Protein backbone atom coordinates (compact mmCIF):
# COMPACT_ATOMS: atom_id res chain seq x y z
CA UNK A 1 0.00 0.00 0.00
CA UNK A 2 0.99 3.64 -0.11
CA UNK A 3 2.52 3.42 3.31
CA UNK A 4 5.91 3.45 4.91
CA UNK A 5 7.66 0.17 5.64
CA UNK A 6 7.44 0.72 9.38
CA UNK A 7 3.62 0.65 9.20
CA UNK A 8 3.52 -3.13 9.16
CA UNK A 9 6.14 -3.33 11.90
CA UNK A 10 4.07 -0.93 13.99
CA UNK A 11 0.95 -3.14 13.80
CA UNK A 12 2.41 -5.62 16.30
CA UNK A 13 3.26 -2.77 18.68
CA UNK A 14 -0.36 -1.55 18.55
CA UNK A 15 -1.53 -5.11 19.20
CA UNK A 16 0.65 -5.21 22.30
CA UNK A 17 -0.40 -1.75 23.48
CA UNK A 18 -4.11 -2.48 23.02
CA UNK A 19 -3.96 -6.12 24.20
CA UNK A 20 -5.18 -7.36 20.82
CA UNK A 21 -4.56 -11.10 20.66
CA UNK A 22 -4.93 -11.57 16.91
CA UNK A 23 -4.53 -9.45 13.80
CA UNK A 24 -5.55 -10.93 10.49
CA UNK A 25 -4.71 -9.61 7.07
CA UNK A 26 -7.61 -9.75 4.69
CA UNK A 27 -5.50 -11.47 2.00
CA UNK A 28 -1.91 -12.49 1.35
CA UNK A 29 -1.97 -13.49 -2.34
CA UNK A 30 -4.45 -11.10 -3.94
CA UNK A 31 -3.34 -11.45 -7.56
CA UNK A 32 -6.84 -11.47 -9.09
CA UNK A 33 -8.58 -8.10 -8.75
CA UNK A 34 -12.13 -9.42 -8.81
CA UNK A 35 -13.31 -6.56 -6.56
CA UNK A 36 -12.12 -3.84 -8.90
CA UNK A 37 -12.86 -5.84 -12.02
CA UNK A 38 -9.30 -5.69 -13.38
CA UNK A 39 -8.77 -9.45 -13.35
CA UNK A 40 -5.41 -11.17 -12.99
CA UNK A 41 -2.59 -8.86 -11.93
CA UNK A 42 0.99 -9.32 -13.02
CA UNK A 43 2.42 -8.41 -9.63
CA UNK A 44 5.96 -8.21 -11.03
CA UNK A 45 4.91 -5.54 -13.56
CA UNK A 46 2.06 -3.70 -11.85
CA UNK A 47 2.08 -2.62 -8.22
CA UNK A 48 -1.66 -1.84 -8.15
CA UNK A 49 -3.35 -4.93 -6.77
CA UNK A 50 -6.88 -3.58 -6.70
CA UNK A 51 -8.83 -0.44 -7.41
CA UNK A 52 -11.88 1.00 -8.99
CA UNK A 53 -11.67 3.42 -11.91
CA UNK A 54 -8.38 5.32 -11.82
CA UNK A 55 -6.99 8.54 -13.20
CA UNK A 56 -3.55 10.09 -13.51
CA UNK A 57 -2.67 12.93 -11.16
CA UNK A 58 0.38 15.08 -12.00
CA UNK A 59 1.80 14.89 -8.47
CA UNK A 60 0.29 11.66 -7.11
CA UNK A 61 0.48 9.40 -10.16
CA UNK A 62 -2.30 6.86 -10.71
CA UNK A 63 -5.07 7.40 -8.19
CA UNK A 64 -8.72 6.58 -7.82
CA UNK A 65 -11.33 5.00 -5.62
CA UNK A 66 -9.74 2.34 -3.43
CA UNK A 67 -6.51 2.41 -5.51
CA UNK A 68 -3.88 0.47 -3.63
CA UNK A 69 -0.39 -0.75 -4.40
CA UNK A 70 0.55 -4.11 -2.92
CA UNK A 71 -2.34 -4.33 -0.49
CA UNK A 72 -3.38 -7.94 -0.06
CA UNK A 73 0.01 -9.22 -1.22
CA UNK A 74 2.36 -10.60 1.42
CA UNK A 75 3.78 -13.26 -0.91
CA UNK A 76 4.75 -13.20 -4.57
CA UNK A 77 4.55 -16.30 -6.76
CA UNK A 78 7.87 -18.12 -7.03
CA UNK A 79 6.50 -19.89 -10.09
CA UNK A 80 3.95 -17.76 -11.91
CA UNK A 81 1.64 -19.90 -14.02
CA UNK A 82 -0.58 -17.00 -15.12
CA UNK A 83 2.30 -14.84 -16.37
CA UNK A 84 5.00 -17.45 -17.09
CA UNK A 85 7.33 -14.92 -18.75
CA UNK A 86 7.67 -13.26 -15.33
CA UNK A 87 8.16 -16.52 -13.44
CA UNK A 88 11.28 -16.92 -11.32
CA UNK A 89 10.88 -20.70 -11.33
CA UNK A 90 11.23 -20.91 -7.55
CA UNK A 91 9.30 -23.59 -5.69
CA UNK A 92 7.17 -21.88 -3.10
CA UNK A 93 6.37 -18.22 -2.52
CA UNK A 94 8.67 -15.19 -2.36
CA UNK A 95 8.20 -13.18 0.84
CA UNK A 96 7.39 -9.49 0.40
CA UNK A 97 9.03 -6.70 2.37
CA UNK A 98 5.61 -6.11 3.91
CA UNK A 99 5.70 -9.63 5.37
CA UNK A 100 9.26 -9.15 6.61
CA UNK A 101 8.35 -5.87 8.34
CA UNK A 102 5.32 -7.51 9.97
CA UNK A 103 7.52 -10.39 11.18
CA UNK A 104 10.02 -7.88 12.59
CA UNK A 105 7.24 -6.20 14.58
CA UNK A 106 6.14 -9.56 15.99
CA UNK A 107 9.75 -10.23 16.99
CA UNK A 108 9.87 -6.78 18.63
CA UNK A 109 6.82 -7.71 20.71
CA UNK A 110 8.54 -10.89 21.88
CA UNK A 111 11.33 -8.69 23.26
CA UNK A 112 8.82 -6.20 24.66
CA UNK A 113 7.05 -9.02 26.50
CA UNK A 114 10.33 -10.23 28.01
CA UNK A 115 11.21 -6.68 29.07
CA UNK A 116 7.75 -6.20 30.60
CA UNK A 117 8.31 -9.28 32.76
CA UNK A 118 11.33 -7.50 34.28
CA UNK A 119 10.10 -3.89 34.38
CA UNK A 120 6.53 -3.35 33.16
CA UNK A 121 6.45 0.39 33.90
CA UNK A 122 9.59 1.21 31.92
CA UNK A 123 8.52 -1.09 29.10
CA UNK A 124 5.09 0.53 28.81
CA UNK A 125 6.77 3.96 28.74
CA UNK A 126 8.87 2.82 25.76
CA UNK A 127 5.80 1.45 23.96
CA UNK A 128 3.88 4.68 24.62
CA UNK A 129 6.80 6.74 23.30
CA UNK A 130 7.08 4.65 20.13
CA UNK A 131 3.31 4.52 19.49
CA UNK A 132 1.71 7.49 21.30
CA UNK A 133 -1.76 7.05 19.79
CA UNK A 134 -3.41 4.45 17.59
CA UNK A 135 -6.83 3.20 16.52
CA UNK A 136 -9.52 4.78 18.74
CA UNK A 137 -7.15 6.88 20.90
CA UNK A 138 -8.12 9.93 18.82
CA UNK A 139 -11.81 9.35 19.38
CA UNK A 140 -14.68 8.23 17.19
CA UNK A 141 -15.74 10.17 14.10
CA UNK A 142 -19.34 8.96 14.04
CA UNK A 143 -21.08 7.35 17.01
CA UNK A 144 -23.53 5.58 14.68
CA UNK A 145 -20.54 4.00 12.91
CA UNK A 146 -17.79 3.88 15.54
CA UNK A 147 -14.77 3.82 13.28
CA UNK A 148 -11.67 5.67 14.35
CA UNK A 149 -10.90 9.24 13.38
CA UNK A 150 -8.69 9.55 10.32
CA UNK A 151 -5.67 11.64 11.25
CA UNK A 152 -1.92 11.77 10.86
CA UNK A 153 -0.03 8.89 12.42
CA UNK A 154 1.58 9.40 15.82
CA UNK A 155 4.66 7.21 15.33
CA UNK A 156 7.91 7.87 13.54
CA UNK A 157 8.30 6.69 9.95
CA UNK A 158 12.09 6.78 10.31
CA UNK A 159 13.27 3.15 10.21
CA UNK A 160 16.31 4.08 12.32
CA UNK A 161 14.02 4.97 15.22
CA UNK A 162 12.59 1.47 15.16
Which residues does each PLM region occupy?
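Catalytic-core regions of glycoside hydrolase
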Residues: 1-37
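Catalytic domains of carbohydrate-active enzymes that cleave complex glycans
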Residues: 20-21, 37-162
